[in-house]
């Protein structure tokens, strides 16, 4: 069962990605994972580690704190 925080972070990743018009394939290629892995992160199925979240923050041009807003 996914933890509510993991689900929230995943939703924030998806929101930011879609606001920037990026595909799951593009962001996956940028951080070195498959688009399927990006899907799992966005659904909260797989937990995003600290280093991976830092990569997301750079690529999505958002501070790490962005992903925890409104928790």
State where each predicted segment sits:
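Short, basic-rich loop-to-helix N-cap that marks the start of a DNA-contacting helix
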Residues: 45-55
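A detector for short, charged/polar N-terminal pre-domain segments
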Residues: 1-8
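A short, glycine- and basic residue-enriched loop/turn
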Residues: 19, 25, 35-38, 45
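Short C-terminal boundary/hinge segments that cap the last helix of small helical domains
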Residues: 60-71
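Conserved hydrophobic/aromatic packing and binding residues within compact polymer-binding modules
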Residues: 13, 27-28, 38-41, 67
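Short basic helix-loop element that most often maps to the first helix and adjoining turn
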Residues: 11-26, 30, 55
């Amino acid at each position: 069962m996914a933890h509510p925080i993991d689900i929230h972070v995943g939703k924030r990743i998806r929101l930011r990605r879609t606001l920037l018009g990026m595909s799951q394939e593009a962001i996956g290629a940028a951080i070195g994972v498959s688009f399927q892995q990006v899907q799992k992160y966005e659904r909260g199925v797989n937990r995003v580690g600290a280093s991976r979240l830092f990569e997301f923050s750079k690529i999505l041009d958002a501070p790490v704190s962005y992903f925890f807003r409104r928790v």
